[in-house]
Swiss-Prot record:
Gene name linked to the record: Or10p22
Phylogenetic lineage: Eukaryota, Metazoa, Chordata, Craniata, Vertebrata
Keywords attached to this entry: Cell membrane, G-protein coupled receptor, Glycoprotein, Membrane, Olfaction, Receptor, Sensory transduction, Transducer, Transmembrane, Transmembrane helix
A Pfam family that the UniProt record links to this protein: 7tm_4
Disulfide bonds: none
Glycan-linked positions: 5
Annotated protein name in UniProt: Olfactory receptor 10P22
Subcellular location: Cell membrane
Length: 312
């Protein structure tokens, strides 16, 4: 497939993990297993938070939508990735690439905002318990979830507007396993200035700012926890927040390193491994850290099993 600098291209080649040779087979089965666990685990959380009245609180409302976004986020990437791992020359049509890019940005930014909303919910519950019902009214938590989805739509649309109008000729090899904005921009044959400005705007507004808000929320939570008189009280509060904090660090940490590395070092194997962590591994962790460390969720699971499996 030779490059023709005068011809508009109709598809991209996703280089992906082609340099891993025989390890691609192991990677295929590993990613497939992780994807199945992600779908089952997050679907279980959605089911539990809908079916059990004890989980009809703002915290689990956020968790349900977070699980839905995790399912959609991974599904945007993994099925195509699995098909490409079994292909000798993985290609993706231009329209499919832009569609993947749009939904990748949409669900990724929605996840960032939902994590921020969940941090605010924990802040309100732990630091302002007497005012929690006022701070986290039904209008507030539904509005925060709606705003998270809206932010994702704005992000995806912003990326799309800047990229869909660019011409692509000649080079068509994307050094990645998905269509992300920066690798695609590098292939455009026109100025990408506004595309990079748009990406910077989205990164600052929907990634850096949410991360700073989460850090501020947990700083306040930490101060409150240290002020609790009994060690049992501290342990309970730490247990409540540790699972959320784990997901936040894993997601924002790897994503930040991947996007903030120097351009000369980007789009190599290290960048792809980092992306693999926050797009594939993190969504799998969500149901485990929230269910195995949360007595209310495990209790709801037991009640659901008793009602439908062990009941009369």
């Amino acid at each position: 497939m030779g490059d023709d600098n005068d011809t508009d291209i109709t598809e991209f080649i996703l280089l992906g993990f082609s340099g891993y040779g025989f390890l691609q087979g192991h990677l295929f089965w590993g990613v497939l297993c992780i994807y199945v666990v992600t779908l089952l685990g997050n679907s279980l959380i959605v089911l539990l938070t809908l079916a059990d009245s004890a989980l009809h609180s703002p915290m689990y409302f956020f968790l349900r939508h977070f699980s839905v976004v995790e399912i959609l986020y991974t599904t945007t990437i993994v099925p195509r990735m699995l098909a490409d791992l079994r292909s000798s020359c993985p290609t993706i049509p231009l329209a499919s690439c832009f569609t993947q890019l749009y939904f990748f940005a949409l669900f990724g930014i929605a996840e960032c905002c939902l994590l921020t909303a969940m941090a605010y919910d924990r802040y309100a519950a732990i630091c302002c318990p007497l005012h929690y019902t006022t701070l986290m009214s039904q209008g507030t938590y539904t509005g925060l979830v709606g705003a998270s989805y809206l932010a994702g739509v704005i992000s995806g649309t912003t990326h799309s507007i800047f990229i869909f109008t660019l011409p692509f000729r000649g080079a068509k090899t994307i050094h990645h396993f998905l269509c992300d904005i920066l690798p695609v921009l590098r292939l455009a044959t026109a100025s990408t200035f506004w595309g990079e400005v748009g990406n910077l705007f989205v990164t600052i507004t929907f990634i850096f700012v949410p991360f700073l808000l989460i850090v501020a929320s947990y700083a306040c939570i930490l101060v409150t926890i240290l002020g609790v008189a009994t060690s049992q009280g501290r342990q309970k509060l730490f247990s409540t927040c540790s699972s959320h904090l784990f997901v936040v660090i894993l997601f924002f940490g790897t994503a930040t390193v991947a996007y903030m590395r120097p351009q000369a070092d980007s789009f190599g194997n290290t960048d792809q491994i980092l992306t693999l962590v926050y797009t594939v591994v993190t969504p799998m962790c969500n149901p485990f850290v929230y269910s195995l460390r949360n007595k209310e969720v495990t209790g709801a699971m037991r009640r659901l099993m008793k009602r439908y499996l062990w009941g009369p």
